[in-house]
C-alpha cells in the first residue's frame, strides 16, 4: 500500500489530484500530510477537511480506506486540527490517522481523546536500542489508560523514512534513516 503526497499542503500528486491518485493508481490508499510540525506547511482545519473529503470520496470509489495519514509533530496545535475536522465536517474519524503519537505526553493525551471519539492512532517504534525501551514504556502507558480501545492503536517502524538530527538550537545537523528492525524490538 502507498500514500500520495508528502508533508506539504497543497498536496503534491502524480495525476494532479488526490482523488485521481487514489482511484487510478492501485497501491494508493490515501494521502499524507504533516500537521503541528515545524516542517509542515501548517494546513488549516478547513484544508484538512478538504483533503479528508477528497481522500474519503476516492476511497469509496476505489474500495480503499481513503486515509489521511498525518505526520504529527510536537507543535502547539497537537491534534487540534484533527478535532476541528471531526467537529466541523462529516468526515468519519476512521479516515484520519495521526502518526508518531508517542512524541509528547500532550500528544498522547490527545490521542486517547481521539480514540474515545472512534479514531485510530499510530505509534512509532524506537529508532535505536534506548528509544525502543522508551517507546515501549510509553506505549504500555498509553494502552493502559482508562477508556483506551487497544484495537484502535497501531505501531509502525517509519522504516527507511528520513530521520533528521537536530542540535539544541533546532538546526538540522545530520540525516539518517529508521531501521525496520526496531519495530520487532519495541513490540
Feature annotation, model-predicted:
Residues 1-4:
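Metal-associated gating/positioning segment near the N- to mid-region
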Residues 127:
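Residue-level signal for short, function-critical loop segments
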Residues 6-10:
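Acidic, glycine-rich active-site loops and adjacent beta-strand->loop/helix elements
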Residues 13-123, 131-152, 184:
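Histidine/acidic residue-rich metal-binding segments in metalloenzymes
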Residues 145-187:
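His/Asp/Glu-enriched, well-ordered alpha-helical/loop segment
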Amino acid at each position: 500500500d502507498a500514500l500520495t503526497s508528502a508533508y506539504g499542503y497543497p498536496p503534491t500528486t502524480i495525476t494532479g489530484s488526490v482523488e485521481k491518485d487514489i482511484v487510478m493508481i492501485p497501491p494508493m490508499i490515501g494521502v499524507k500530510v504533516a500537521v503541528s510540525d515545524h516542517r509542515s506547511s501548517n494546513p488549516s482545519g478547513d484544508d484538512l477537511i478538504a483533503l479528508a473529503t477528497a481522500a474519503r470520496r476516492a476511497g469509496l470509489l476505489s474500495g480503499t480506506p481513503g486515509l489521511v495519514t498525518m505526520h504529527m509533530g510536537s507543535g502547539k496545535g497537537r491534534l487540534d486540527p484533527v478535532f476541528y475536522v471531526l467537529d466541523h465536517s462529516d468526515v468519519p474519524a476512521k479516515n484520519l490517522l495521526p502518526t508518531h503519537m508517542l512524541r509528547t505526553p500532550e500528544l498522547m493525551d490527545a490521542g486517547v481523546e481521539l480514540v474515545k471519539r472512534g479514531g485510530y492512532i499510530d505509534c512509532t517504534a524506537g529508532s535505536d536500542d534506548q528509544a525502543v525501551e522508551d517507546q515501549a514504556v510509553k506505549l504500555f502507558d498509553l494502552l493502559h489508560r482508562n477508556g483506551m480501545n487497544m484495537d484502535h492503536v497501531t505501531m509502525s517502524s517509519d522504516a527507511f523514512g528520513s530521520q533528521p538530527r537536530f542540535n539544541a538550537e533546532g538546526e538540522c545537523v545530520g540525516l539518517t534513516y529508521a531501521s525496520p528492525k526496531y519495530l520487532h524490538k519495541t513490540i
